[in-house]
């Protein structure tokens, strides 16, 4: 079964999306959380990769598993093992030919650059 999920994260504490040995990444944390509820090493594929410190509101991922459980159990289970700065927002079973990167119909990026002499209290990350 192939599962697609939407991931939201605050990336300031991570070295980007892509997993790397001995470095804290978003993908690495998600795959560790999936392992915690499945006891299987499951690889995830994302619609795109973000750099260190970058946040995401709706990064789409997919992964394959033979385990069957309600979709809300995937969401709650994975979230229970993730740091608070990473959240799975939803999960859906998708067709086997769905691909998070290649099936995307559009991508949206927003850049916020503060050009001021005083640091922002709410934009400090």
Where in the sequence are the language-model features?
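Structured-RNA-binding interfaces characteristic of tRNA pseudouridine synthases
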Residues: 1-125
